[in-house]
Structures are given as structure tokens and as C-alpha cells.
UniProtKB/Swiss-Prot annotation:
InterPro entries assigned to the protein according to its UniProt record, in alphabetical order: TatA/B/E, TatB
Subunit comment: The Tat system comprises two distinct complexes: a TatABC complex, containing multiple copies of TatA, TatB and TatC subunits, and a separate TatA complex, containing only TatA subunits. Substrates initially bind to the TatABC complex, which probably triggers association of the separate TatA complex to form the active translocon.
Annotated segments matching region Disordered: 69-111, 124-162
Name of the protein in question: Sec-independent protein translocase protein TatB
Localization of this protein: Cell inner membrane
Composition skew (Basic and acidic residues), residue ranges: 83-111, 124-141
Pfam families for the chain: TatA_B_E
Length: 162
């Protein structure tokens, strides 16, 4: 909003500490925080009111029409996405009659899909556990090598001094 970096904020904080003093500084920051919060709330409320007014006036419909006119490829993709959504909604297994053959098959498919998802999740968890164990083993090897290295360098240092 004000495009202030950390260094600018630090300078402002130091100046505020000098001007206000350490005793009243927390109160000042609290009041500034409240003010900023209220200002953001008012800005959000204003934006929401403007969007509501635009929706009531039909600006969003006009905007959609302009978008369609200026970007025919995007509007075609939007219609494809909408058709896909409609198709997936129509295939939803919960919408079939559970007593019909289609409903029974859909329920079986949904159950099998859940089993597959559970097996996949279990396999992923096993793989992650295996990788974590391998990483821990590598870390232990590295620590062992690291602890062995100073001892060998210390003995070589004593040999060079003698």
C-alpha cells in the first residue's frame, strides 16, 4: 500500500521510539494497528459496495460480453469447462437410484475408487517412511564420518609437531 521496506519500517520505528519514548510506544503501535485495521475494513466495505452496485446495474453481464467479444478462444474454453462440469455433475454416483443396476455399479465404482485412493495413500506413506529412514541412515553415516575425521586430523597434527 505505502510500499515500505523493512529498512524504512526500522527507521520509522527508531524515530518513533525516540519521539514517543519506550513507555508509550506499545500504545502508539496498538493505536496505529487499530487505525490501519479500520482503514482496511472501510476499503473492503467500499469495494464490496461498489461491486454490489455494479452487479445490480448489470455491469458484470456487460463485462462478460466484452470478454467474450475480445477473447473468443477464452470464451470457448469457458464453455468447454462448463460442459465438463455439467458432465461430471451428471455422472455423480450419488445421483443414481441405489436400487437400479446403474446405481449399484456406480456405488461399486465409487467404493473401488476409495480403495484405490487408500492403497495409493498407504503406498505413498510407506515410500515416505522408507525415504526418511534412508535419509536418517545417510545422516548417521555422515555424522560418523565427520566425528572420525577430526580424530584422524588431530593425530596427524601431533605427528607433524613431533
Amino acid at each position: 500500500m505505502f510500499d515500505l521496506g523493512w529498512t524504512e519500517l526500522l527507521v520509522i520505528g527508531v524515530v518513533a521510539l525516540i519521539v514517543v519514548g519506550p513507555k508509550d510506544l506499545p500504545k502508539l503501535f496498538r493505536n496505529v494497528g487499530r487505525f490501519v485495521g479500520k482503514a482496511r475494513g472501510m476499503a473492503r466495505e467500499f469495494s464490496r459496495a461498489m461491486e454490489d452496485a455494479a452487479d445490480e446495474a448489470g455491469v458484470s453481464d456487460i463485462q462478460k460480453t466484452f470478454k467474450t467479444a475480445t477473447n473468443p478462444m477464452g470464451s470457448a474454453m469457458d464453455s468447454v469447462k462448463q460442459a465438463t462440469r455439467d458432465l461430471t455433475d451428471s455422472i455423480d454416483p450419488t445421483k443414481f437410484d441405489p436400487e437400479s443396476e446403474t446405481g449399484k455399479l456406480a456405488a461399486d465404482r465409487a467404493e473401488n475408487a476409495k480403495k484405490i485412493q487408500a492403497a495409493t495413500a498407504r503406498a505413498a506413506a510407506d515410500r515416505m517412511a522408507r525415504e526418511a529412514a534412508e535419509a536418517a541412515a545417510k545422516a548417521e553415516e555422515a555424522e560418523a564420518a565427520l566425528s572420525a575425521t577430526p580424530a584422524s586430523t588431530a593425530s596427524s597434527d601431533s605427528e607433524t609437531k613431533a
